[in-house]
């Protein structure tokens, strides 16, 4: 009887780990350029099952309108259409950051996260990839703490020195909702992994290479080229011609998909937060990551064009 139980457990475990990773992407897509490339990479990743895409606010940007989540949803919907994934839910998140942990309201995004998380478990968790502010995922957990055990959160944010364990929280995503970030860091029950800006900045795409590849992808390619060409960086005077782009968000998505070329370690949280361990990526292989990124997209687009 004991042998049968062990065998059953091993079979269940094998099935779970051979399945695609169920993922919700939470992104501030309209904020920049790299989000678009990250979402395309996630949607074409054979190891992923994208459960839905939600949008997060980026109110600190000088380009921010009165409804940044709506801006991002429009772009997300366009990408889903271009990749023939119209059936994937696309939802809007909170328009403002959390002002107090005692007055949290839900949004379409946080409601969706709660609903989907309840379908998973600790042994078969739902992965939430946060590419912008942490408003939606924090709101979801605060409103229904029971989902914490059913999810893994991957966050793209803040700077971190792995040698000294020094944190610099003066980073765009973190500034857009510092209360939400603190809540995640302080939550001892939450499985949290961070792709720091320090590590992700090493993934850089060159325009000449990117455009030559995108020209093969018809409408999707032209859509991404237009975004690259039309966006003007507000945070730097360097590279005004947009010859290169740091692919912060792509680094996180591809790190999850390619664990053999992305390396993380356990670190104590910042000194002002509840003391616990979180995972932080310390190194990636940008060259291999870039090669695999384009290879899978090319494979998907070729298959799509022949359907």
Model features per residue range: what roles?
Residues 1-20:
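Bacterial Sec-dependent N-terminal signal peptides
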Residues 19-307:
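N-terminal acidic, glycine/proline-rich low-complexity segments
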């Amino acid at each position: 009887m004991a042998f049968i139980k062990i065998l059953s457990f091993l079979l269940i475990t094998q099935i779970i780990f051979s399945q695609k990773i169920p993922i919700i992407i939470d992104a501030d897509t309209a904020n920049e350029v790299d989000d678009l490339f990250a979402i395309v990479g996630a949607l074409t990743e054979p190891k992923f099952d994208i459960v839905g895409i939600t949008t997060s606010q980026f109110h600190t940007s000088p380009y921010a309108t009165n409804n940044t989540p709506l801006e991002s949803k429009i772009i997300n919907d366009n990408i889903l259409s271009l990749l023939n994934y119209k059936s994937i839910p696309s939802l809007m998140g909170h328009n403002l950051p959390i002002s107090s942990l005692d007055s949290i309201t839900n949004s379409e995004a946080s409601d969706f996260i709660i609903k989907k998380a309840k379908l998973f478990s600790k042994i078969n968790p739902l992965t939430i990839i946060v590419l912008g502010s942490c408003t939606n995922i924090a709101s979801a957990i605060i409103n229904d703490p029971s989902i914490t055990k059913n999810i893994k959160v991957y966050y793209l944010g803040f700077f971190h020195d792995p040698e000294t364990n020094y944190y610099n929280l003066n980073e765009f995503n973190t500034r857009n909702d510092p209360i939400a970030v603190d809540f995640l860091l302080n939550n001892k029950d939450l499985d949290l992994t961070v792709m720091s800006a320090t590590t992700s900045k090493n993934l850089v795409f060159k325009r000449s290479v990117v455009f030559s590849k995108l020209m093969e992808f018809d409408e999707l390619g032209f859509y991404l080229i237009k975004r690259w060409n039309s966006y003007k960086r507000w945070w730097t005077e360097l590279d005004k011609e947009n010859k290169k782009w740091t692919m912060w968000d792509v680094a996180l998505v591809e790190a999850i998909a390619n664990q053999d070329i992305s390396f993380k370690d356990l670190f104590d949280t910042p000194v002002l937060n509840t003391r616990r361990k979180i995972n932080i990526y310390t190194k990636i292989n940008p060259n291999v990551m870039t090669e695999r990124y384009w290879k899978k997209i090319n494979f998907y687009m070729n298959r799509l064009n022949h359907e």
